[in-house]
Regions:
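Short beta-strand/loop element within the Bergerat-fold HATPase_c
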Residues: 81-93
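Conserved short strand/loop->alpha-helix "switch" segment adjacent to the catalytic nucleotide/phosphoryl-transfer site
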Residues: 18, 36-66, 72-83, 111
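C-terminal end segment of the histidine kinase catalytic
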Residues: 145-157
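Glycine-rich nucleotide-binding loop
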Residues: 83, 105, 137-144
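Acidic ATP/Mg2+-coordinating residue in the GHKL
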Residues: 101
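Short beta-to-alpha transition helix within the HATPase_c
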Residues: 1-5, 9, 16-34, 89
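ATP phosphate-binding glycine-rich loop and adjacent ATP-lid/helix-beta elements
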Residues: 108-135
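A short beta-strand-to-loop micro-motif at the C-terminal edge of the catalytic HATPase_c
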Residues: 77-79, 133-140, 148
Length: 157
Protein backbone atom coordinates (compact mmCIF):
# COMPACT_ATOMS: atom_id res chain seq x y z
CA UNK A 1 0.00 0.00 0.00
CA UNK A 2 2.82 2.44 0.84
CA UNK A 3 4.57 1.89 -2.50
CA UNK A 4 1.30 2.61 -4.32
CA UNK A 5 0.95 5.79 -2.24
CA UNK A 6 4.48 6.87 -3.14
CA UNK A 7 3.77 6.30 -6.81
CA UNK A 8 0.52 8.27 -6.55
CA UNK A 9 2.27 11.16 -4.77
CA UNK A 10 5.08 11.29 -7.29
CA UNK A 11 3.02 10.97 -10.44
CA UNK A 12 0.87 13.91 -9.35
CA UNK A 13 3.88 16.10 -10.20
CA UNK A 14 5.20 16.82 -13.67
CA UNK A 15 8.41 15.34 -15.05
CA UNK A 16 10.63 18.22 -13.90
CA UNK A 17 12.73 18.64 -10.77
CA UNK A 18 10.97 17.64 -7.58
CA UNK A 19 11.29 19.33 -4.18
CA UNK A 20 11.54 16.47 -1.66
CA UNK A 21 9.92 18.09 1.38
CA UNK A 22 6.36 18.21 -0.07
CA UNK A 23 6.64 14.54 -1.09
CA UNK A 24 7.84 13.59 2.38
CA UNK A 25 5.02 15.63 3.96
CA UNK A 26 2.51 13.59 1.94
CA UNK A 27 4.32 10.40 2.90
CA UNK A 28 4.19 11.49 6.55
CA UNK A 29 0.42 11.96 6.26
CA UNK A 30 0.13 8.45 4.80
CA UNK A 31 2.03 7.07 7.81
CA UNK A 32 -0.24 8.92 10.22
CA UNK A 33 -3.29 7.43 8.48
CA UNK A 34 -1.75 3.97 8.40
CA UNK A 35 -0.17 3.79 11.87
CA UNK A 36 -1.50 6.79 13.80
CA UNK A 37 -4.19 5.03 15.82
CA UNK A 38 -2.06 1.99 16.62
CA UNK A 39 1.22 3.77 17.37
CA UNK A 40 1.22 7.15 19.16
CA UNK A 41 4.51 8.16 17.52
CA UNK A 42 5.51 11.72 16.70
CA UNK A 43 6.88 11.84 13.13
CA UNK A 44 8.87 15.01 12.38
CA UNK A 45 10.43 16.32 9.17
CA UNK A 46 13.18 18.92 9.22
CA UNK A 47 16.14 20.29 7.33
CA UNK A 48 16.78 21.55 3.83
CA UNK A 49 14.20 21.23 1.07
CA UNK A 50 16.22 19.36 -1.52
CA UNK A 51 15.24 19.51 -5.17
CA UNK A 52 16.03 16.32 -7.02
CA UNK A 53 15.02 14.54 -10.22
CA UNK A 54 11.75 12.59 -10.32
CA UNK A 55 13.75 9.33 -10.30
CA UNK A 56 15.73 10.40 -7.24
CA UNK A 57 12.54 11.57 -5.50
CA UNK A 58 11.01 8.13 -6.08
CA UNK A 59 14.10 6.31 -4.79
CA UNK A 60 14.50 8.57 -1.74
CA UNK A 61 10.79 8.20 -0.93
CA UNK A 62 11.04 4.40 -1.17
CA UNK A 63 14.06 4.34 1.16
CA UNK A 64 12.46 6.74 3.67
CA UNK A 65 9.24 4.72 3.51
CA UNK A 66 11.09 1.51 4.38
CA UNK A 67 13.14 3.07 7.19
CA UNK A 68 10.16 4.84 8.79
CA UNK A 69 8.04 1.67 8.49
CA UNK A 70 10.80 -0.28 10.27
CA UNK A 71 10.91 2.32 13.03
CA UNK A 72 7.12 2.22 13.51
CA UNK A 73 7.09 -1.57 13.63
CA UNK A 74 10.21 -2.32 15.67
CA UNK A 75 11.63 0.66 17.57
CA UNK A 76 9.02 1.16 20.25
CA UNK A 77 8.14 -2.34 21.47
CA UNK A 78 6.85 -2.14 25.02
CA UNK A 79 6.64 1.65 24.93
CA UNK A 80 3.65 3.95 24.90
CA UNK A 81 5.12 6.61 22.60
CA UNK A 82 8.18 7.74 20.72
CA UNK A 83 9.59 10.01 18.07
CA UNK A 84 10.82 9.44 14.53
CA UNK A 85 12.72 12.22 12.77
CA UNK A 86 13.50 12.55 9.07
CA UNK A 87 16.26 15.12 8.50
CA UNK A 88 17.33 16.37 5.06
CA UNK A 89 20.69 18.05 4.44
CA UNK A 90 21.84 19.57 1.18
CA UNK A 91 25.53 19.47 0.31
CA UNK A 92 27.57 20.59 -2.66
CA UNK A 93 27.72 17.22 -4.45
CA UNK A 94 25.93 14.93 -2.04
CA UNK A 95 22.74 15.25 -0.04
CA UNK A 96 21.87 13.21 3.01
CA UNK A 97 18.70 12.00 4.62
CA UNK A 98 18.68 10.65 8.16
CA UNK A 99 15.85 8.62 9.66
CA UNK A 100 16.26 8.37 13.41
CA UNK A 101 14.11 7.23 16.30
CA UNK A 102 14.37 7.38 20.07
CA UNK A 103 13.29 3.77 20.45
CA UNK A 104 14.93 0.84 22.13
CA UNK A 105 17.57 0.20 19.48
CA UNK A 106 17.82 -3.02 17.53
CA UNK A 107 20.43 -5.29 16.04
CA UNK A 108 17.73 -6.62 13.69
CA UNK A 109 18.33 -3.70 11.35
CA UNK A 110 21.87 -4.93 10.66
CA UNK A 111 20.72 -8.48 10.00
CA UNK A 112 21.86 -9.59 6.54
CA UNK A 113 18.58 -11.47 6.04
CA UNK A 114 16.46 -8.36 6.60
CA UNK A 115 14.79 -7.90 3.20
CA UNK A 116 13.76 -4.30 3.88
CA UNK A 117 17.31 -3.26 4.73
CA UNK A 118 18.65 -5.14 1.71
CA UNK A 119 16.23 -3.11 -0.44
CA UNK A 120 17.41 0.10 1.25
CA UNK A 121 21.10 -0.77 0.74
CA UNK A 122 20.60 -1.72 -2.92
CA UNK A 123 18.49 1.33 -3.75
CA UNK A 124 20.94 3.75 -2.13
CA UNK A 125 24.04 2.10 -3.60
CA UNK A 126 22.82 1.21 -7.09
CA UNK A 127 20.24 3.87 -7.90
CA UNK A 128 21.23 6.85 -5.74
CA UNK A 129 25.01 6.24 -5.93
CA UNK A 130 25.33 6.70 -2.19
CA UNK A 131 25.93 4.86 1.06
CA UNK A 132 23.84 3.81 4.07
CA UNK A 133 25.13 3.98 7.64
CA UNK A 134 23.43 2.28 10.59
CA UNK A 135 23.86 3.25 14.22
CA UNK A 136 21.71 1.54 16.83
CA UNK A 137 21.90 1.56 20.60
CA UNK A 138 19.81 1.85 23.73
CA UNK A 139 18.82 5.44 22.85
CA UNK A 140 17.43 4.49 19.45
CA UNK A 141 18.46 3.93 15.88
CA UNK A 142 19.82 6.38 13.34
CA UNK A 143 20.09 5.48 9.66
CA UNK A 144 21.64 8.25 7.59
CA UNK A 145 22.14 7.75 3.87
CA UNK A 146 23.79 10.02 1.37
CA UNK A 147 23.39 10.25 -2.36
CA UNK A 148 24.91 12.03 -5.32
CA UNK A 149 22.77 15.02 -6.28
CA UNK A 150 21.47 14.80 -9.85
CA UNK A 151 22.93 17.98 -11.35
CA UNK A 152 20.30 18.06 -14.11
CA UNK A 153 17.84 19.45 -11.54
CA UNK A 154 19.81 22.67 -11.17
CA UNK A 155 18.79 25.67 -13.24
CA UNK A 156 21.05 26.67 -16.08
CA UNK A 157 22.52 23.21 -16.65
Amino acid sequence: QSIASINEILTANDEGPAPLMPFLEKLKNQFLLLYGAEYPIDLKLSGDDLTVSQDQATDVALVVNELVSNAYKHAFKGRENGEIRVILKNGERYASVTVQDNGTGTEEIRNEGNFGMMLVQMTVKDKLKGKVYVESGENGTSVPFDFLIDKSTETGI
